[in-house]
């Protein structure tokens, strides 16, 4: 078993490489946090709720020797709704298109049926190199980490997966994140940069704004609600008649839930929760866009939207 740590780092190649890597894993395995750490800026929303990622987000890592485009997929799981099936389809389509797959497995949780389910799917993809990434290493001691590394090595042997690398990382503590980029780079094809210098994602601004609002709305809600929340930015326009040195961006967005009974959970007593969502997301949006924002939020019911193909399309899935 070859496990990489910082001391075993090899010199960088002189050729330039560019390509796509995708992180897979069950929900809440740390994929979005790792994407943000590698890019150096928030491009994917994170939450301690599973299943928060719904779109494939391309985060772009610029290096002297390479451009690494990270595709952050939803967590693969056994679907219970049409939305769940759509999310799984997104994952499998992404796998077929990337140059390297990173399988994220949390250090603080023993391998379970969900991990085996994904590993079996990966075993069927023969040509694409696969890197096992042991995430959240800051949450365990060295003995637990060693046991997890051995278990992952054994899982690969059992299913016929030849791991290109097994890399322990902590995105939150910034441990071995640069090493991971170093190890992914040689697995990319040689070629020029695919995106301009300075671009960190190809997500449209309206999608990123909607995701930041959804991230704020996910905080502190009960377990059944996260999957019922969708956000659509209806309008994003500079306020007219503002002086050039005091711009203001008007953003009008709708937060959709599935049942009228969920409205009170999102809005909160006397509108306090919705106000908190607005304040938190506005701060993040202003940091992202670099301009003051007026955020107008409304909560609407889209009945059982996760199971309705028409509603899914209208909400961008």
UniProtKB/Swiss-Prot annotation:
Residues 17-190 form the Era-type G domain. Residues 135-138 are annotated as: G4. Residues 25-32 are annotated as: G1. Residues 51-55 are annotated as: G2. Residues 169-171 are annotated as: G5. GO terms for cellular component: cytosol; plasma membrane. One of its GO terms (molecular function) is GTPase activity. It comes from the Bacteria. SUPFAM superfamilies: P-loop containing nucleoside triphosphate hydrolases (SSF52540), Prokaryotic type KH domain (KH-domain type II) (SSF54814). It is found in: Cytoplasm; Cell membrane. Residues 72-75 are annotated as: G3. Keywords: Cell membrane, Cytoplasm, GTP-binding, Membrane, Nucleotide-binding, Ribosome biogenesis, RNA-binding, rRNA-binding. Monomer. Belongs to the TRAFAC class TrmE-Era-EngA-EngB-Septin-like GTPase superfamily. Era GTPase family. An essential GTPase that binds both GDP and GTP, with rapid nucleotide exchange. Plays a role in 16S rRNA processing and 30S ribosomal subunit biogenesis and possibly also in cell cycle regulation and energy metabolism. This is GTPase Era. It comes from Streptomyces coelicolor (strain ATCC BAA-471 / A3(2) / M145). The gene is era.
